[in-house]
């Protein structure tokens, strides 16, 4: 999970509920990342696959271990802060589906303050299109629509 040679690998999950809303976590981090919304996920442990890391991190950050992963939908490299250092992170995003509307995630700010997570919410695709807030990955609504076969 460390930033080895200023590179880090991470798995993330784009969780959709039955209404195709996507779960995002708000991170308040030092520059270069700053305040942004992103999918649950995090760094790989030694010997761990991207998908296994995505599942583990989703469970750690939300308590959910029953989200079905439907396959990889995106790869990206982005600049993050990790352990007080800027590093490049190679990320693989997996589409996940939950069969229920989940309204409670608990106090993520208290549980994950050390990770910079300060809030969570479900976003509709039109809300993602309209927001002026920074969303990672960029173009998330289009990625989801492409996977769901929508425009």
List the predicted regions and their residue ranges:
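Short connector loops at helix/strand junctions that flank enzyme active sites
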Residues: 8, 34, 39, 87-93, ...
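Nudix hydrolase/Nudix homology domain
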Residues: 34-36, 100-151
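Conserved hydrophobic/aromatic beta-strand scaffold that supports enzyme active sites
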Residues: 24, 93-95, 122
């Amino acid at each position: 999970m460390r930033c080895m040679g200023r590179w880090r690998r991470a798995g993330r999950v784009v969780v959709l509920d039955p209404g195709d809303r996507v779960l995002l976590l708000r991170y308040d981090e030092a520059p270069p990342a700053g305040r942004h919304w992103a999918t649950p996920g995090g760094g790989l442990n030694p010997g761990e696959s991207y998908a296994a890391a995505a599942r583990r991190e989703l469970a750690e950050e939300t308590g959910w271990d029953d989200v079905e992963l439907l396959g990889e939908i995106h790869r990206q490299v982005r600049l993050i802060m990790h352990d007080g250092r800027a590093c490049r992170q190679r990320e693989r995003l997996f589409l996940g589906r939950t069969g229920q509307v989940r309204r409670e995630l608990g106090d993520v700010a208290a549980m994950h303050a050390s990770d910079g997570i300060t809030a969570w919410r479900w976003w509709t695709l039109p809300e993602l299109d309209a927001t002026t807030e920074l969303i990672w990955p960029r173009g998330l609504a289009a990625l989801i629509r492409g996977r769901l076969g929508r425009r």
